[in-house]
């Protein structure tokens, strides 16, 4: 595997470290051991309407992050950077794990993209997608958002936030080969991969430049030739918060903005899709009519397939990020889900909320402080009638959204945690709560792939209400319009000012 060769001595040191951690985790009073912090645990292990098919602990490294799946392989990024221990870099395995999933019951780590490409000091691989038609793995590397407090990361300010593109065709699937790098004009935070449903080979990435409050849109169609063209950078005119992320309609004409404390709004992104000179975005929802609530605010926004509703999720960390040190404050009761009626996108309205019991204020009144626990909604992937969402220490949740105004529980999966890992997440798993379901779920061939920050990659089968919807899916993820997304909500070519050639419009 490129960039990951280690000496026998280094491998022995790492095995010894994991073994020592396993022993320490069983001892009372040891920092980071289960039950040692005085915090209560969030949930017992449960599997309601989920069947565990396979699991990889990803070498017990901890600090796992983004997930991308293609063919017989899954790729798992890291929330932290590569730490130099002694004279060797990346002994905490902070690169991108390559996992063979040809047998979903036995996923196996077969390599890692490490130095000099990944797993560097001051670099985290927290966002990834696969452009399947081009067989390209897209890795968004973050440095500007690298912090000791949240990511156990060592910010130096010298590493740029870039997108790396890896060829994963043929033999490169198990040993990805870097072929191009794109350095955006603004530091990225998250991105949505959009493939033009009417122009084969055309792909855009919609980037939330959170620190700049901007939406940056870039044409990556020429990625294999190292060609990238920024179509526009729009300063979102919402007076508070920052653009954290956005969902994009299948036709690319609308964006559903998660603007942290600024809340939720709908935007027109047709300029970028039609590649107009001076392309920019425009708010369809006037800023004064946006839906907002107390911070930290909107983290993820996804439109429901075939329904005039948007699914909003917060992300809220533990009490260590509470007031007065942090504004807006984090902590109990953390974050949950809101269903927004967008039948009139100029005046969206809150239709319903969905919470776990731990997200009720009454729970906080009786619960001990949890400085490094988050029982918060995070990243969703939707089918027409289900929301599959990671909920940090609340595990992995299925929500029936067939009636968007009345979302109800459809299942939950909370595994037993690993005894020990190389690196606990300082903000999410350093206390007693050792489950941290984090990634966007990816559905491939009817099975669900999801990553826990601490405990690795899980492969699940959903067996609850609307199970046939999930089992029929070839590919679906919450942060692109790839695969079955187009089947669930076919785009209308006649909405473009210049419809594609051969289109017959009324």
Task: Please report, for each region that a protein language model flagged, where it lies by residue.
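Compositionally biased, low-complexity flexible segments
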Residues: 1-6
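Secretory targeting and sorting signals
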Residues: 7-36
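Feature marking well-ordered beta-strand scaffolds used for ligand recognition
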Residues: 21-24, 34-506
């Amino acid at each position: 595997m490129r960039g990951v060769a280690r000496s026998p001595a280094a491998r022995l040191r790492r095995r010894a470290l994991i073994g020592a951690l396993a022993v320490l985790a069983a001892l009372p009073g040891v920092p980071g051991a289960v039950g040692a912090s005085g915090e209560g645990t969030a949930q017992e292990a449960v599997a309601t309407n989920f069947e565990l098919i396979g699991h990889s602990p990803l070498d017990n490294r901890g600090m796992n992050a983004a997930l991308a799946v293609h063919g017989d392989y899954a790729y798992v990024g890291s929330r932290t950077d590569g730490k130099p221990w002694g004279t060797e870099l990346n002994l905490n395995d902070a690169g991108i794990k390559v996992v063979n999933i040809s047998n979903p019951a036995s996923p196996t780590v077969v390599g890692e993209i490490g130095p000099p490409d990944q797993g560097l000091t001051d670099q985290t691989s927290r966002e990834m997608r696969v452009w399947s038609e081009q067989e390209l793995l897209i890795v968004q590397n973050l440095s500007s958002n690298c912090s000791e407090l949240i990511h156990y990361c060592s910010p130096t300010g010298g590493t740029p936030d870039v997108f790396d593109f890896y060829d994963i065709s043929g033999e490169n699937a198990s040993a990805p080969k870097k072929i191009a790098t794109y350095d955006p004009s603004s530091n990225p935070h998250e991105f949505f991969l959009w493939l033009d449903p009417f122009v084969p080979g055309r792909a855009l990435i919609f980037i939330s430049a959170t620190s700049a409050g901007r939406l940056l849109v870039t044409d990556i169609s020429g990625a294999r030739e190292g060609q990238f063209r920024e179509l526009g950078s729009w300063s979102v005119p919402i007076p508070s918060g920052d653009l954290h992320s956005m969902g994009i309609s299948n036709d690319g004409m609308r964006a559903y903005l998660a603007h942290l404390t600024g809340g939720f709004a709908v935007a027109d992104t047709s300029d970028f899709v039609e590649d107009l000179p001076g392309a920019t975005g425009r708010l369809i929802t006037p800023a004064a009519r946006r839906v907002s609530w107390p911070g930290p605010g909107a983290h993820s926004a996804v439109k429901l397939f075939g329904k005039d509703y948007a699914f909003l999720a917060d992300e809220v960390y533990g009490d260590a990020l509470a007031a007065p040190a942090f504004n807006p404050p984090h902590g109990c009761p953390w974050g949950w889900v809101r269903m927004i009626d967008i039948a009139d996108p100029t005046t969206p309205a809150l239709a319903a909320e969905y919470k776990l019991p731990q997200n009720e204020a009454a729970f906080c009144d009786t619960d001990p402080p949890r400085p490094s626990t988050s029982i918060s909604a995070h990243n969703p992937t939707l089918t027409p009638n289900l929301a599959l969402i990671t909920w940090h220490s609340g595990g992995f949740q299925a929500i029936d959204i067939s009636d968007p105004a009345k979302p109800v529980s459809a299942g939950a999966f909370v595994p037993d945690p690993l005894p020990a890992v190389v690196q606990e997440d300082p903000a999410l798993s350093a206390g007693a709560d050792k489950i941290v379901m984090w990634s966007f779920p990816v559905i491939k061939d009817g099975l669900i792939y999801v990553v826990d920050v601490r405990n690795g990659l899980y492969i699940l089968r959903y067996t609850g209400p609307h199970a046939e919807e999930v089992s029929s899916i070839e590919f679906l993820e919450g942060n692109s319009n790839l695969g079955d997304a187009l089947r669930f909500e076919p785009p209308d070519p006649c909405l473009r000012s210049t419809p594609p050639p051969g289109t017959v419009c009324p």
